């Protein structure tokens, strides 16, 4: 515990808050090019093949982004838009690919929560 005099001389040091999406550099989304599209397995209690892509952003940072929804059309050199948002059971995946924008197609036959998957309203 510092004395009053020590606090007057030095003051308290501000605790810095770690950013959750540093690669976006305070932008809402960022554009990038897929360098690798592959599947990974999630952490311990879960089991699946999660679709992810390694993306090189326009600011030259390379990140791993999750491809949400059922089925996708992404391959190497696809231009994608990424947003923040981690995937809890995939370590190191802190970004999501925005469906229905740039080269990413929306999810086909999606009826509920369509706006999150870039799906048009069914007739």
Swiss-Prot record:
GO terms for molecular function: rRNA binding; structural constituent of ribosome; tRNA binding. One of its GO terms (cellular component) is small ribosomal subunit. GO terms for biological process: translation. The keyword RNA-binding applies. With S4 and S5 plays an important role in translational accuracy. Interacts with and stabilizes bases of the 16S rRNA that are involved in tRNA selection in the A site and with the mRNA backbone. Located at the interface of the 30S and 50S subunits, it traverses the body of the 30S subunit contacting proteins on the other side and probably holding the rRNA structure together. The combined cluster of proteins S8, S12 and S17 appears to hold together the shoulder and platform of the 30S subunit. NCBIfam families: rpsL_bact. Belongs to the universal ribosomal protein uS12 family. PANTHER family: 30S RIBOSOMAL PROTEIN S12 FAMILY MEMBER. Part of the 30S ribosomal subunit. Contacts proteins S8 and S17. May interact with IF1 in the 30S initiation complex. This is Small ribosomal subunit protein uS12. It comes from Maridesulfovibrio salexigens (strain ATCC 14822 / DSM 2638 / NCIMB 8403 / VKM B-1763). The lineage of its organism: Bacteria, Pseudomonadati, Thermodesulfobacteriota, Desulfovibrionia, Desulfovibrionales. The gene is rpsL.
């Amino acid at each position: 515990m510092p004395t009053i005099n020590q606090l007057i001389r030095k003051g308290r040091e501000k605790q810095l808050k770690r950013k959750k999406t540093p690669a976006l550099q305070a932008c809402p989304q960022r554009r990038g090019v897929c360098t690798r599209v592959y599947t990974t397995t999630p952490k311990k209690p879960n089991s699946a093949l999660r679709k992810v892509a390694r993306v090189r952003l326009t600011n030259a940072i390379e990140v791993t982004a999750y491809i949400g929804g059922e089925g996708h059309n992404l391959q190497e050199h696809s231009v994608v838009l990424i947003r923040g948002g981690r995937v809890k059971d995939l370590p190191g995946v802190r970004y999501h690919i925005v469906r229905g924008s740039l080269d990413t197609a929306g999810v086909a036959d999606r009826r509920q929560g369509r706006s999150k998957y870039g799906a048009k309203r069914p007739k």
